A protein has these predicted regions:
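Membrane-cytosol interface segments of multi-pass membrane proteins
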Residues: 1-242, 249, 253-256, 272, ...
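Active-site environment of divalent metal-dependent phosphoester hydrolases
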Residues: 90-91, 265, 369-374
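Short, locally clustered residues in the helix-turn-helix/winged-helix DNA-binding domain
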Residues: 118, 340, 371
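Transmembrane alpha-helix segments characteristic
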Residues: 228-232, 332-334, 367
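Alpha-helical transmembrane segments and terminal signal-anchor/GPI-anchor hydrophobic tails
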Residues: 251-353
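Generic helix-packing signal
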Residues: 264, 362-365
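Hydrophobic alpha-helical transmembrane segments in multi-pass integral membrane proteins
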Residues: 301-307, 365-378
Length: 448
């Protein structure tokens, strides 16, 4: 059984517990679909109209606790901090931890999106849904991704266009004033992906791969492993021997994204098998998982810090090469184990500080150069004056950006998702119902 995070009060209803978990997590990393959210909300609304006799006569339904995914927010937060440290030219230098963080972003994105789309696709296949439902599912998928990442990216690019040539050179590393072309940046032209702007086109490109990948895997039914095993071998081979670095096309980074997607497939299949068979972990199962996880963490830390167990136990068998270190397979192994059998590792990453950094990580990633390369802060003679000024101002800037741009964009994406779900299920009368549901939602928020 998958573990869930306790709420603290044993007597709290299961529904409140689920809402707390889902609201605490980033909307895009939540395990719930819009359908489940609607069912929970409508259930509360219907319950208020039932008589007390009906309520007493109804049997209590037991709901499975939501999957524990909060630690992934903490992983994203740590990755954002590592990017800032790498670009600061002052903290944790010499280890290329920024590259590790970028790979972590890529893996998290592909893992979560593959997982969510696969669950949605399995549901549609079980319902024998028609082409109309599949079209709505794809529109919902792409609209959520668009409103999650593009608005802040576009506003940042527009803001850069109004900056002086000196500011563009200082904060986004433009060598010449003519290097910046707003239209080329907004349309992801390859030669206009300066500084941190190079990663978003790669992620968006892979968004189009995920639906094809998921449907291909599901089409193989019980022979899904026939594709997963050789693809896993290929990912490891490419990660070890292929050169990858920043500001390159998607092709050399496909193994990184694919590692996350393969991990999502393995997790979904294992999760379904565990629930369908009623499998219970015995002590020796847990011991085996912890041994594999411990060895994986040891190798991951050794790769990141270029030593440790490679100096103490065994030299690194992988040939050293320039470019990004290969960590995607190690990260996904840890993710799957923690999702199946959580431990203190996931609990550690559920620390609220890391999870908050994870919530604002996209703003931190795009805007951190305005703080860490600010000449006034950099001119401070004392180390801790610079450190705390950067932390405070970066948190302030990223939080402001999140609540002014990211959060409203996500709400708009969720609103569109609810509208699409209503249109799909109710057809022509859906617009009226959607408006009523929106008013009920707003009323509920006011009462809270």
């Amino acid at each position: 059984m998958l573990k869930s995070t306790p709420t603290g009060n044993v007597g709290e209803p299961d529904t409140e517990f689920q809402v707390r978990v889902l609201e605490a997590s980033d909307p895009e990393t939540s395990t719930s679909s819009s359908d489940s959210e609607h069912q929970t909300f409508v259930g509360h609304a219907d319950a208020s109209t039932k008589s007390s006799v009906e309520k007493l006569s109804e049997p209590k339904l037991t709901h499975a606790p939501p999957t524990k995914v909060l630690f992934l927010d903490g992983v994203r937060g740590l990755a954002a901090i590592l990017v800032v440290a790498q670009h600061s030219k002052e903290y944790l230098q010499g280890f290329n931890l920024g590259a590790v963080a970028v790979d972590a972003f890529f893996v998290l994105s592909s893992f979560l999106l593959t997982w969510l789309f696969m669950k949605k696709s399995m549901k549609l296949l079980a319902q024998e849904a028609g082409i109309r439902s599949w079209i709505f599912a794809l529109v919902d998928y792409f609209s959520k991704r668009f409103f999650r990442v593009y608005p802040l990216f576009a506003i940042t690019a527009i803001g850069i266009s109004f900056m002086s040539a000196e500011a563009q050179r200082r904060y986004f590393l433009f060598l010449n004033p003519g290097d910046f072309d707003l239209y080329q940046v907004l349309t992801f032209e390859f030669n206009h992906r300066q500084f941190v702007l190079w990663t978003l086109p790669l992620e968006i490109s892979y968004y189009f791969v995920i639906p094809v990948f998921v449907l291909a895997i599901l089409g193989m039914r019980r022979f899904w492993w026939v594709a997963v095993v050789p693809l896993t071998v290929w990912v490891v081979h490419q990660g070890v021997y292929e050169y990858r670095t920043s500001h390159t096309p998607l092709e050399p980074h496909i193994p990184t994204f694919l590692a996350g997607s393969l991990a999502a497939v393995v997790f979904v299949k294992l999760d379904v098998w565990i629930k369908s068979t009623g499998f219970k972990f015995r002590w020796w199962h847990t011991l085996m998982l912890r041994t594999v996880e411990g060895l994986t963490i040891a190798v991951l830390l050794s790769v990141c810090f270029k030593g440790l167990f490679f100096d103490w136990v065994e030299p690194n068998p992988v040939p050293t090469a320039k470019g990004f270190p290969f960590v995607s397979a190690l990260l996904t192994t840890i993710f799957v184990i923690e999702m199946i059998r959580p431990s203190c590792v996931s609990t550690m990453f559920e620390w609220n500080v890391l999870r908050y950094w994870g919530k604002i990580s996209f703003s931190v990633y795009l805007l951190h150069s305005f703080v860490i390369w600010n000449p006034t802060i950099s001119a401070q003679p004392k180390y801790f004056n610079r450190l705390f000024a950067r932390i405070f101002l970066l948190l302030l800037l990223a939080t402001t950006s999140y609540y002014l741009v990211e959060y409203p964009s996500q709400l708009l994406g969720q609103r569109i998702s609810r509208f699409l779900a209503t249109r799909e299920t109710k057809g022509s009368g859906s617009l009226v119902k959607f408006a009523c549901m929106e008013r009920i939602t707003m009323r509920k928020k006011e009462l809270q």
